[in-house]
């Protein structure tokens, strides 16, 4: 009987520890995203509409992410150039593309690899229906 109680107690402590460390890791990641200069950057000709963050609900929450929504009438390449220049000035690197409408960059942080995705095609939002450009922060697994 004593062995079963000890095993159960150990399992409960381990589960609680895993849950708490996972939650605190997401909180630290969210804090890093919010403090990154790109999270509050503005650019002439690119209007910021608002942002949304991933929810930590449920037993297995999605990867930590934050998306900023914009509208712009600038040519696509000029929009990319303005945002990517600011990103490079703030420690982002390893730029690559995924088709003509998506750019990626990454940087290493104390919580792992963080990535930004600049896009005209990803993530549409009912809350910001006029958005035609997004900047998404996410952590690589």
Task: Give the label of every model feature segment.
Residues 2-6, 13-141:
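An acidic-aromatic pocket/loop used at catalytic or ligand-binding sites
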